[in-house]
């Protein structure tokens, strides 16, 4: 190919192409196709300009080379082929004298007749694809684009071809000749296939086969293939683009990009009001389990059988009393509901054969607690659209709540280790490939760090409760079914253990849509006295139902046992996600993996073993008012898992909004820390968007308080 180029092109063009490749550090002995492409492009630019002049009247004329005429001015200024510094000098000079807008990229020519810069393209592919790439890269309506192909096709901005038919035909003929000459030497196929879209300096990673098809399928709308998208991304200029878009929107909008300095950000304002309350679907750190070890009773594994067996392990039941009423509820109904559960469990035990499921009698207290007949009657819109005062019922704004320390305590507890194992090591077949070996090694190390974690208990508890509730909602739609809240684990010694946390009673559940609500009453055992933090238990009615003997350093002590009762609701879509809470393990494992990968790429070897076994090393876990908290790799695993689990337990629109908006501020602060001199506009609007998500959700308020700690330390 190199020999062909030297024979086929004018020596001046070859010399300019050599210079250009040298400037970009490319070897023409290796990049022979690129060498040919640069020469072709240069020749087309020169042919475009050749013989075109402007006469004294300012008209464009064509003068053949033998016509000596010194008074004529060249119609086109050639920018292509000059070294970069000189080329920009020419561009700046043209802009200063003609008032043309300065282009972001070096164009190829300037047309003095039409007063516009021109970008010339020569492509071995389809002209419209290459045209799009050029347009996406340049993003300027002022620069005119003209694309030629080796097949005689052309495409230009607004179909304005600038030159006369004959001049363009000369260029097309020359390109066709080059193609034939290459083909006769067996060089054309390689040259045609080597075009990589809008050229950038760095090497492209070629994608082929299935990955190529998948890449083309997963593009945003309006992009036909990965090259188009790459060209668009390569030429993307965020600041100019934002300012330009805003000025298009309205003449009044003026986006001034302000520098973002250490003194710029202020803390996020947390709302004032009464303290926030517990809103998870089941108790977390305050739950109490009635457990049986090595269960082998008849019907073991059937929830109702397991629950009755667990209930029999406790002998301290007493007459229940309300110790913390629910402010807005009818508390005697909650009391009667618990008594009814006890009675109906007694009735089951006296039966000859215990049933697999238990439907509660539809008593007045349960009907009240489950909101039976409380929903307003639904009327078809067509039947009432003529009603003159038809309106949607008013809904009150949610009351603002302030941050409360109990949610930080909940999170700390979720990161702790328990004395039980909550997940088994998945038994997966022999590793076949080295990468599988590394993956299973990482999974095993990670599992060992989190299998005892309380957050893992919450996962298994959540999966069980949501699965049982969704099953019952579909199988017994009209029944008030009693659903035991159960989990299974192993002791440190490896003995199996079944735990009962309490019960759920499900209301009517004709769930047609994903968001249709099923009401339920939850009744959960606890040793936590609700009077210590009454604000946390605002939505609960708490009963004292027994006394439990506990072993302590000073012997056995008796502690009151409480029952936390509340009405709650969930939907098919929420239960579906609750059933998939095991995904939290995967998410946190992937976060740990990216840390290992970063370490491995620095050391140029797999660092999995060192990562988990080097106990002396500490890692950043989070930020507290005292500064950056650090801990062992196990603590990092458990903290990441707890965050993922709490995102699932406390999922809400407030969390979605806060996460999305605060992330923007986080990225700006990180850019500042990395000395990237970030600029912003409408920072006040961003703070507004963040703060409108801070209403009453405890997990969102905790995240906001963490974010403020991060801001304080990041900007010191």
From Swiss-Prot:
Motif (Nuclear localization signal 1 (NLS1)): 124-139
Record bears the keyword Membrane: no
GO CC, alphabetical: host cell cytoplasm; host cell nucleus
Binding site for Mn(2+) 2: 80, 108
Enzyme class: hydrolase
Any matching Pfam family: Flu_PA
Manner of cofactor binding, per the entry note: Binds 2 manganese ions per subunit.
Motif Nuclear localization signal 2 (NLS2), chain ranges: 184-247
Cofactor(s) recorded in Swiss-Prot or TrEMBL: Mn(2+)
One GO BP: viral RNA genome replication
UniProt-listed Enzyme Commission number(s): 3.1.-.-
Membership in a protein family: Belongs to the influenza viruses PA family.
Annotated protein name in UniProt: Polymerase acidic protein
Native organism: Influenza A virus (strain A/USA:Texas/UR06-0195/2007 H1N1)
